[in-house]
């Protein structure tokens, strides 16, 4: 059974599943759907079209599904879609998409979005990601599974952050970050691979050694991207995990962080 505080404002067209909780002074607008077991704290604003999955927790003063400030936006009915088991901490802002891109901002499952972070329009966040306090993603940003963006990380529009990547505090990212890579600084510079995070996720020493070799091929041998891709082919044949690194470089439209 849902638990709706009498001081909350729920639009009649909103759809709330069983077990949803909505705290005082929160507003759930039209064309919002909230899945089973999701908890909406006090002073939260949810604006549609927005679909929120199961067992999420959204803390106070967050604004989810607001119109994008993109000046091309003219009120089209774009979407925000959030998966399951996400934690959205205090003061987070997540905007809906634009018709110039996917018309949708997407958040996967099991993500932690910490206080005052911002996710811009048309961005795509994978699963098991962490955006630490005050991290800000511009529009059209893609963040791969298990990526961690430390506090005050800034990401330029259209950048792609690869799976398992890591950014240090205050990093300003203007180019794509390949999978597994750790970046620091303003502007961002590649420092290593996220070996500590990979160990915690069960990557074997043999695979870590292969990824270290892959990193050196791309970042330490003075090769062009095309030359590095050819050298990585041999490693990919032995270690499928290297393919994720290789593909994130090969598919980069903005160029990779060096």
Swiss-Prot record:
Pathway: Glycolipid biosynthesis; lipid IV(A) biosynthesis; lipid IV(A) from (3R)-3-hydroxytetradecanoyl-[acyl-carrier-protein] and UDP-N-acetyl-alpha-D-glucosamine: step 1/6. One of its GO terms (cellular component) is cytoplasm. Its main location: cytoplasm. It comes from the Bacteria. Its EC number is 2.3.1.129. It catalyses: a (3R)-hydroxyacyl-[ACP] + UDP-N-acetyl-alpha-D-glucosamine = a UDP-3-O-[(3R)-3-hydroxyacyl]-N-acetyl-alpha-D-glucosamine + holo-[ACP]. One of its GO terms (molecular function) is acyl-[acyl-carrier-protein]-UDP-N-acetylglucosamine O-acyltransferase activity. It is an enzyme of class 2 (transferase). One of its GO terms (biological process) is lipid A biosynthetic process. It is found in: Cytoplasm. Keywords: Acyltransferase, Cytoplasm, Lipid A biosynthesis, Lipid biosynthesis, Lipid metabolism, Repeat, Transferase. Involved in the biosynthesis of lipid A, a phosphorylated glycolipid that anchors the lipopolysaccharide to the outer membrane of the cell. Homotrimer. Belongs to the transferase hexapeptide repeat family. LpxA subfamily. NCBIfam families: lipid_A_lpxA (TIGR01852), PRK05289.1 (NF003657). This is Acyl-[acyl-carrier-protein]--UDP-N-acetylglucosamine O-acyltransferase. It comes from Pseudomonas entomophila (strain L48). The lineage of its organism: Bacteria, Pseudomonadati, Pseudomonadota, Gammaproteobacteria, Pseudomonadales. The gene is lpxA.
